[in-house]
UniProtKB/Swiss-Prot annotation:
PANTHER family reported in the protein's UniProt record: 30S RIBOSOMAL PROTEIN S12 FAMILY MEMBER
Localisation per UniProt entry: Mitochondrion
Domain of life of the native organism: Eukaryota
Keywords of this entry: Mitochondrion, Ribonucleoprotein, Ribosomal protein
Statement: the UniProt record of this protein carries the keyword NADP: no
Basic and acidic residues bias: start-end ranges: 10-23
Protein name: Small ribosomal subunit protein uS12m
Ranges for region Disordered: 1-51
Family: Belongs to the universal ribosomal protein uS12 family.
GO molecular function terms listed in the Swiss-Prot or TrEMBL record: structural constituent of ribosome
Gene Ontology CC entries for this record: mitochondrion; small ribosomal subunit
Biological processes annotated in GO: translation
Amino acid sequence: MPTLNQLIRHGREEKRRTDRTRASDQCPQKQGVRPRVPTRTPKKPNSAPRKIAKVRLANRHDIFPHIPGEGHNSQEHSMVLIRGGRVKDSPGVKSHCIRGVKDLLGIPDRRRGRSKYGAEKPKSI
């Protein structure tokens, strides 16, 4: 514990907060190219492989966003749009790919929660 004299001479150093959105430059969405197509296994109680993408953003940051929904058409060197939002059981995955934008297609024949997965409105009978 510092003495009063030491505090007068030096003061207290403020804690620096870590920036969780460093890769996105405080932007709501960011565009990137996908150089690799890996999958990851989640943390302990869960076991299904999670579909993720290694994406190089326009500002040269490499991030690992999650691809939501069942199945995807994403390949190497396809353009994707990234938004925030982490995946709780996958360490290091702090963003999501946006379906139905750029080269990542939406989910066909999806009826509910369509806006989250880039699905078109079904034709009424």
